[in-house]
Amino acid sequence: MLLCTARLVGLQLLISCCWAFACHSTESSPDFTLPGDYLLAGLFPLHSGCLQVRHRPEVTLCDRSCSFNEHGYHLFQAMRLGVEEINNSTALLPNITLGYQLYDVCSDSANVYATLRVLSLPGQHHIELQGDLLHYSPTVLAVIGPDSTNRAATTAALLSPFLVPMISYAASSETLSVKRQYPSFLRTIPNDKYQVETMVLLLQKFGWTWISLVGSSDDYGQLGVQALENQATGQGICIAFKDIMPFSAQVGDERMQCLMRHLAQAGATVVVVFSSRQLARVFFESVVLTNLTGKVWVASEAWALSRHITGVPGIQRIGMVLGVAIQKRAVPGLKAFEEAYARADKKAPRPCHKGSWCSSNQLCRECQAFMAHTMPKLKAFSMSSAYNAYRAVYAVAHGLHQLLGCASGACSRGRVYPWQLLEQIHKVHFLLHKDTVAFNDNRDPLSSYNIIAWDWNGPKWTFTVLGSSTWSPVQLNINETKIQWHGKDNQVPKSVCSSDCLEGHQRVVTGFHHCCFECVPCGAGTFLNKSDLYRCQPCGKEEWAPEGSQTCFPRTVVFLALREHTSWVLLAANTLLLLLLLGTAGLFAWHLDTPVVRSAGGRLCFLMLGSLAAGSGSLYGFFGEPTRPACLLRQALFALGFTIFLSCLTVRSFQLIIIFKFSTKVPTFYHAWVQNHGAGLFVMISSAAQLLICLTWLVVWTPLPAREYQRFPHLVMLECTETNSLGFILAFLYNGLLSISAFACSYLGKDLPENYNEAKCVTFSLLFNFVSWIAFFTTASVYDGKYLPAANMMAGLSSLSSGFGGYFLPKCYVILCRPDLNSTEHFQASIQDYTRRCGST
């Protein structure tokens, strides 16, 4: 507040000097003032293009040094029409007359001058600064205008300490909605915040992620470009090139040539131009001069429908122009009002006499010279802007209507302070020619944008409304069938740094922009989530994905199920073996006292058959989903059972060698072996050693059910962990040593009596056992699939079958098929024959 006060004190001196200067040498037009019960101010750019540099602290004389601005003229007339309609209305502000003071704000100095004029006390040449501004009554109650963001910010800052309502028809910058800085600012044009969001949605809709961005150097352009860059990059859009055109930019100068070169080199098909009309004209004249064609130009509302831009010679060759435009609205009767003004007899400008209250910028000689056939044409862009000025006047009138209590049909005529009117204007909500006029909490209008495309019919320009943008939130509605693209087959132009990757390919950024990338397929076991296109994510433990996948699939859980044909075959074979073992045990029990059974070991055969049955029973643990009991028992029980069988086989062969070869040669050893029950002791010790190995194995390297994920990317293997342990290896090495011992003993007994000579059968069974396990371990080294347990079971079944077949089947054959060989006489004859052979040698 102190800063504003200090500025106003300094400006008070300036305004006194300026008025003194103006009143000596200027004139004013009666069209700029209208007396009334309550006055409004209108700030309009009736002139523009004031290029001279001031060397003295003087206000620009718009009528003398600037060119006529047709657009500003239509705004000027829209306010005059609005006030006239309100004064003629019996419903709105009955028995109250509105007056106005209109100013030509062709330059910043003219704008400051006009603002200070409306802030001054009625009939005074100064602004009275006092501690309490609550009861300060300036010349006007409200201000309509000015046109640009820069000038609106200046005016709003000066009006803010006094809370004089200011309704701008053209200042769209988002910063003006900050009420801490501009508490009395309202507007009838949409906030640039929504324009920027609309542009981003437009870019996203057509997949344009690689764009160039150009703005003007005023607040409108710079703030708009900055906001658009922030929002666009936040939505994954990359800015290939960005530049701001200076106020001094001219067609063909080095600055614009450099800008054109960079635009061409950037390679972006889409260029967003967020600029004022004046610099947009310079820009597109440079584009035409450089022959920069084949692009899509996205226009901000300031120039999207401006004839000032469409009139650039050769602009129809530059490519496609899409734009965001203020929703097309017409001021009813404005054209007729302007025509009537052109036909009317104008009063001559009155001179400013010393001490009078007039201004050099309340004069428009061109306006007074208009005839019906020379008056400016009312075009779409000017009509939309004029409507914003028109409804700003009505918003003030409705606020004053409520403040004066006019709802009863008659208005009170008490003193009104600007801050009181500001509160009422913020609350207005009414229909104006079927258009709702109201303000949100930021005092922005409830409005919308049109999305337009330029059309050319030869040299004639027109535009097509493609859709609209509404808020909040911002939503874009476009009828794409109305768009005629300037490319092959009416296809949407592409504006990307890199084309989209194939499904399942991640983007690897090259350079500084995330829109520029290479496509690399996701590795096996990873997938590309659409939420992050730049990083392949790993699948879950129970999932898998092939290379280049955008989703994960559940892994297939595999194990040797009972329902499989392989399982049926193995199950039948193992069951058959068990039945044979059981049948053999019964057969041997029935013929226990026969020579064949006694020579096979007698009761020791039942231990051998039982151990084989235990090993066979353990094989059932390989079927179905692995469980803890199955994992604990299946390999250990098999190893222990086969150890007992091999121990019995070894000791049986060794015992025959002792009887027939060492009983006479080494009688002491023979008697010690028999008296100390060497056979049973050997079997017990050998089995105990294997039992110790197995117990250590089960305790230290406990076999447990496990889910294996590494071998196959798409499978989960259910297995036991026994084959990965040292205990498993030790147990099978121990059985290997026993097999070698049994083989050696059998080989040493190859020349025993025929009925006791089992070398051939035992050798065959042991060799088959070796081959079976060598085949299994070879298979396991190259194959890790679901049928590995089946291979393991087959090796075990082969070992058991070879042991049973090599040792017991020949004896079963003699018992069942050759009972003549199962006699004491036959065995005695065989022993006698062996004795004769040994004696002869």
UniProtKB/Swiss-Prot annotation:
Chief location category: membrane
Signal peptide boundaries: 1-20
Molecular function as annotated in GO: G protein-coupled receptor activity; taste receptor activity
Organism for this UniProt entry: Homo sapiens
Subcellular location: Cell membrane
Record text on subunit structure and interactions: Forms heterodimers with TAS1R3.
Entry-linked PANTHER family: CALCIUM-SENSING RECEPTOR-RELATED, TASTE RECEPTOR TYPE 1 MEMBER 1
Family indicated by similarity: Belongs to the G-protein coupled receptor 3 family. TAS1R subfamily.
Carbohydrate-modified residues: N87, N88, N95, N291, N479, N529
Record keywords: Cell membrane, G-protein coupled receptor, Glycoprotein, Membrane, Receptor, Sensory transduction, Signal, Taste, Transducer, Transmembrane, Transmembrane helix
Any GO BP: sensory perception of umami taste
Chain segments annotated as transmembrane: 568-588, 604-624, 640-660, 681-701, 726-746, 762-782, 796-816
Cytoplasmic-facing ranges: 589-603, 661-680, 747-761, 817-841
GO annotation, cellular component aspect: membrane; plasma membrane
Function description: Putative taste receptor. TAS1R1/TAS1R3 responds to the umami taste stimulus (the taste of monosodium glutamate). Sequence differences within and between species can significantly influence the selectivity and specificity of taste responses.
InterPro entries, A to Z: ANF_lig-bd_rcpt (IPR001828), GPCR_3 (IPR000337), GPCR_3_9-Cys_dom (IPR011500), GPCR_3_9-Cys_sf (IPR038550), GPCR_3_C (IPR017978), GPCR_3_Ca_sens_rcpt-rel (IPR000068), GPCR_3_CS (IPR017979), Peripla_BP_I (IPR028082)
Residue intervals annotated with topology Extracellular: 21-567, 625-639, 702-725, 783-795
Identification of the protein by name: Taste receptor type 1 member 1
Membrane topology field: Multi-pass membrane protein
Taxonomy, superkingdom: Eukaryota
Source species taxonomy: Eukaryota, Metazoa, Chordata, Craniata, Vertebrata
